[in-house]
Amino acid sequence: MPKEFSRTQRVAQQLQKELAMILQREVRDSRLGMVTISDVEVSRDLAYAKVFVTFLCIGEQTPESCLAALREHEVQIRMMLGKQIRLRLTPEIRFYYDNTLVEGMRMSNLVTEVINSDKRRKHEAGRDEDEA
């Protein structure tokens, strides 16, 4: 019976859980706002981890400024992660902004615009036929 998940996927899931806990409880930085880890990709040799994050920015904060603040804590977060997980080597962590949520909202708005435009055209075409 084959394994459902490869080791890298299991490690990625565990890293996601542990990083979420670390960011929630240990990292104190007012520049971050609320951070959500949307995905973690681990290299095959488990040496590197790409951590995709989204932010709930407050006030003057932008996703770019929040990401810059988070990147300042990469070494500290990696040290805390090394204490939490049992791996021979703690992966080097790189944070990336995940814009899939923003892109999804943009696409949804475009679809809504097209539907509304189509309804307006049909309504206007129906009115023109009534007048003729």
From Swiss-Prot:
Compartments reported by the entry: Cytoplasm
Originating gene: rbfA
Stated role: One of several proteins that assist in the late maturation steps of the functional core of the 30S ribosomal subunit. Associates with free 30S ribosomal subunits (but not with 30S subunits that are part of 70S ribosomes or polysomes). Required for efficient processing of 16S rRNA. May interact with the 5'-terminal helix region of 16S rRNA.
Highest rank taxon of the organism: Bacteria
GO cellular component: cytosol
Main location: cytoplasm
Organism: Vibrio cholerae serotype O1 (strain ATCC 39315 / El Tor Inaba N16961)
Gene Ontology process terms (BP): maturation of SSU-rRNA; ribosome biogenesis
Record text on subunit structure and interactions: Monomer. Binds 30S ribosomal subunits, but not 50S ribosomal subunits or 70S ribosomes.
Protein name: Ribosome-binding factor A
Keywords in alphabetical order: Cytoplasm, Ribosome biogenesis
Keyword Nucleus: no
Protein family (similarity comment): Belongs to the RbfA family.
